[in-house]
A protein has these predicted regions:
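Short gly/pro/ser/thr-enriched loop/turn and capping motifs at secondary-structure boundaries
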Residues: 55-59, 118-122, 153, 300-302, ...
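Gly-rich Lys/Arg/Thr-decorated short loops/hinges at beta-loop-alpha junctions or inter-strand turns
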Residues: 17, 156-158, 225-240, 258-265, ...
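Active-site cofactor/cluster-binding pocket
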Residues: 2-262
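Short glycine-rich or small-residue beta-strand-to-loop segments that form or flank ligand, phosphate
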Residues: 18-25, 176-178, 266-269, 316-319, ...
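Peripheral docking tails and interdomain loops at the edges
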Residues: 26, 150-152, 159-163, 177-182, ...
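Flexible, low-complexity linker and terminal segments
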Residues: 237, 245-254, 262, 392, ...
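Thiamine diphosphate
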Residues: 17-106, 253, 266, 274-370, ...
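Conserved thiamine diphosphate
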Residues: 84, 90, 138-153, 197, ...
């Protein structure tokens, strides 16, 4: 039994919401600490939003600012839409983590610093002049500073174990996790269950981490330094079953749910790339749903395998980030020509080229809409949050299957790795997905035409299977190889209308280009009517957003509306083709602002399509917008 010192009764301060930022070296277990505390708050009933911020280098020199890993969590008893602009509590494991993140802490905020990470060496590596220690030089007097020797306390907790010093020090994050659970009144049963699952085959490591976790909690209970705990009550949420979900998990579960609803096997062809790889990991854990995952040798093989799976009657899907999507481009043109279902997920990151793999961006919109040779229209949709990734992945499948077309779903690194509570939908509430399968026919293929197996004669065009005959939506039938009488040609060379034979006829090419474009345009007929996310139906200014800018825009818009400003917010999920009601909506406002993490790609599409004088707010720093940045831009535009 662990010896538990006598507890005292601290003050309890109620908070509506809290933003906490964990930061340290990439080997300090920061992401695990943040994700476990997030899970505890989600299970408690708080609304949560997270922002894991990874260093760009796989393992930067220890103790340097380049190697700082961060995890920001916003949790509350009210709706939470962003990870927060500024944090209330900053937990840092070394001097570099403080230097990188101090500007994100509110004045008067709490700093919990591992004092062992502020020795001379760490101060030099972090770039503090003359090894000046911020924990002792008075520079942090505007904050509530709590230096804690986490390293020493962790080693003390593991005294008497057979673990080496390095193994003991790897448990430091468990001390921090235990203490933070005490500080915010959360039980540690959740992290203990996690440890039991993680170390079930390593009892010594299980016991060590559990000891340190409890030591951190008990430290808060007995230390005279910490006199206040914080209480954040559960948020009112609709009844149902919830789990914490990241954007990549949402995409994976959405693909599975849609494939099940459509009665199709899901085939996912992928090549590992940051930040999309977790989709492959999640799908590979769900093979009991009939999911087939294939890790290809390169991006081209991955997408071509997915196309082949769709040709064979499965739901083909693939994912990548910008550089990988560039490699898939020729194959996407093939999928357009074949007119078969294919879901392509682009988890956007900082570019161009290799760019900043661990940082977020929205700069692949033009690539998605226009990035293929020839006239090759593909529907493009975008998710707005981790939970919306489920909805939009499901919609991507529905569109791809029912309209026989590839579909591009845009997410980004921010929402892919961020998490929020997700309510499990009822299967009956999911919209039906009906594949347009062709029916088998009593015919055989023969040179020069199609033969009737029963009569041994060449069929007329009326009687023969026409793979490119279309229904009223412009959709061709899905003919599965091996089905009797449905033999037809495929390939990337232009097809003859209806028959699918190879054709170089000029007028036929014009017709096929027009038919493919019309089919994609008609998809907009099935969109739900466009609606505002908040604000008046007409007025002074409309904020038009897309993708992961949703939370920051919504937070800013709601605050501005409360202050009496004539500001509305609409968030676009259909980026090509646009919703048919968008033109009329844009015309009802004097000014339009488009915040996006690129140099104005959606803004220019809106200008080209609707001749609207849209103004841009553009950020390409590898970081998401804050609500304050949106607010400042709106007020500036209103004042013009």
């Amino acid at each position: 039994m662990d010896t538990i010192p006598k507890a005292r009764t601290p003050n309890v301060e109620a908070r509506e919401k809290v933003v906490i930022l964990f930061a340290g070296d990439s080997g300090d277990g920061i992401q695990l600490t943040g994700s476990q505390f997030t899970d505890s708050n989600a299970l408690f009933g708080n609304d949560v939003s997270t922002f894991p911020n990874y260093p760009a280098e796989i393992r930067a020199p220890q103790g340097t600012t380049a190697g700082v890993s961060g995890f920001q969590l916003h949790f509350g008893s009210v709706d939470v839409f962003t990870p927060g602009d500024m944090c209330d509590t900053l937990v840092v494991m070394n001097a570099a983590a403080l230097k990188v993140n101090l500007h994100k802490l509110k004045k008067g905020g709490i700093i919990i610093a591992n004092s062992d990470g502020f020795d001379g060496k760490n101060l030099r590596l972090a770039g503090y002049a003359d090894e000046k220690n911020p924990l002792t030089d008075g520079s942090l007097d505007n904050y509530v500073l709590h230096p804690v020797d986490v390293t020493k306390l962790t080693r003390n907790a593991l005294e008497g174990t057979t673990l080496g010093m390095k193994e003991k020090d790897r448990s430091k994050n468990m001390f921090v996790l235990g203490f933070i659970h005490w500080m915010y009144g959360r039980k540690i049963e959740g992290p203990e269950k996690f440890l039991e699952a993680k170390f079930k085959t390593k009892p010594e490591l299980l016991e060590a981490n559990r000891k340190v976790l409890r030591a951190g909690y008990n430290f808060g209970d007995t230390s005279e330094t910490f006199t206040t705990r914080f209480e954040v009550k559960p948020a009112p949420m609709p009844k149902g079953t919830y789990r914490n979900i990241t954007g990549n998990q949402g995409v994976a579960i959405g693909l599975i749910a849609a494939a099940q609803k459509a009665g199709l096997e899901l085939f996912y062809g992928s090549y590992p790339i940051t930040p999309a790889s977790d989709i492959l990991h999640e799908l590979s854990r769900n093979k009991h749903f009939g999911v087939k995952t294939f890790q290809a040798e390169d991006e081209i093989a991955a997408v071509c395998a997915a196309i082949g799976a769709s040709y064979g009657g499965a739901l083909g899907a693939t994912a990548s980030s910008g550089p990988g999507i560039a490699l898939k481009t020729e194959a996407l043109g093939l999928a357009v020509m074949l007119e078969i279902p294919l879901v392509v997920v682009n988890v956007q990151r900082g570019g161009p080229s290799t760019g900043m793999p661990t940082k977020t961006e929205q700069a692949d919109l033009w690539q998605a809409v226009h990035g293929r040779n020839g006239e090759a229209p593909i529907p493009v949709i975008a998710a707005s949050s981790p939970t919306d990734c489920f909805e939009m992945a499901y919609e991507a499948v529905k569109t791809a299957v029912e309209h026989m077309t590839p579909v591009i779903l845009l997410t980004d690194g921010y929402m892919a790795n961020g998490a929020e509570p997700w309510r499990f939908p009822e299967a009956k509430d999911l919209r039906p997905i009906v594949p347009p399968f062709a029916k088998p026919r009593d015919t055989d293929e023969a040179e020069g035409g199609t033969l009737s197996a029963a009569e041994g004669r060449v069929l007329s065009e009326v009687e023969a299977f026409l793979p490119y005959a279309r229904d009223e939506r412009g959709v061709r039938p899905w003919a599965i190889p091996g089905m009797k009488g449905l033999q037809h040609r495929i390939g990337g060379i232009e097809k003859e209308d209806k028959t699918g034979n190879i054709s170089y006829d000029p007028l036929n090419h014009q017709r096929m280009v027009d038919l493919r474009a019309e089919k994609v345009n008609m998809i907009a007929d099935g969109f739900r009517p466009i609606r505002l996310d908040s604000g008046p139906e007409s007025g002074e200014l409309l904020i038009v957003g897309w993708g992961s800018t949703y939370g920051a825009i919504r937070t800013a818009a709601l605050d501005l509306q409360k202050e009496g400003h004539s500001v509305a917010h609409v968030h676009l999920r259909h980026l090509f083709p646009f919703n048919k009601g968008l033109r009329g909506l844009l015309q009802r406002y004097r000014k339009v602002l488009v915040p996006e993490m690129n140099k104005g790609q959606l803004r220019q599409l809106l200008r080209a399509e609707f001749l609207v004088d849209a103004q841009g707010l553009n950020k390409v720093q590898g970081l998401p917008f804050t609500a304050q940045e949106i607010r400042n831009a709106v007020l500036e535009l209103l004042a013009r």
